[in-house]
């Protein structure tokens, strides 16, 4: 019923832990390598025969969609190399998948971060389980699960808990990762056509006239196109925050929070909190 899909590159220090944690679940393991030069592929071969190469193209969604396409089961759970399974109720999970075929399963992720007071944990729910024929990934970086028909979808909380150490890096590595993310995010924002100056001007305008039906429809269309923009702005702010460039972080957070956002969304809550810290 379920395949676990993983994209990886030079993760010899993390991949064995990841794959070993799923070894006894009975799930198919699919590993896609995007250009490792270390022992990553050799380690993967100890746990699965389903290893594929994908030329890196600065697009995480493209790589993950390729991995999903290689799964032989109708449902997939997408996992990162620096994540590992902590808890799972397989019987309950399969029951929930069967009861929610057109929905996306959210799993509990525990982010482990080193702080001044030692190891700290941050918990969140993330969309990771879905039918491969109905959903795919969009977004060059910090990719999101999107319905193939582009409609909104419902989610359910799956009985799966994973650990994540991707944020628990030495200062130099953490900054390098943040700078890589910034480059990809700025490219994606550029491709979307968003412009900071134009956005600020639009916010300052006070349109007094009554919109025509055509203008209202146009605004609805534009709003749908811009749904991903605040999330990109949040991710840019977060990446600059991780790189310890707090002025830039505040700049992007301010633009992100200028949109009419649902305050209960996890990324909105985190954006407000991190903006305050910055």
Question: Each predicted region: which residue ranges?
Answer:
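Cell-envelope/extracellular polymer assembly enzymes that use nucleotide-activated donors
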Residues: 1-3, 28
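Short, well-formed alpha-helical segments that are part of the catalytic scaffolds
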Residues: 6-25
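Acidic helix N-cap motif at the loop->helix transition within catalytic regions
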Residues: 13-16, 38-47, 88
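A conserved acidic beta->alpha catalytic loop
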Residues: 21, 33-42, 56, 80-84
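Conserved donor nucleotide-binding strand/loop of the catalytic core
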Residues: 27, 41-66, 70
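Catalytic-site signature of metal-activated, phosphate-bearing donor transferases
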Residues: 62-68, 79, 85-251, 255
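Short aromatic/hydrophobic "clamp" motif used to bind/position activated sugar donors
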Residues: 76
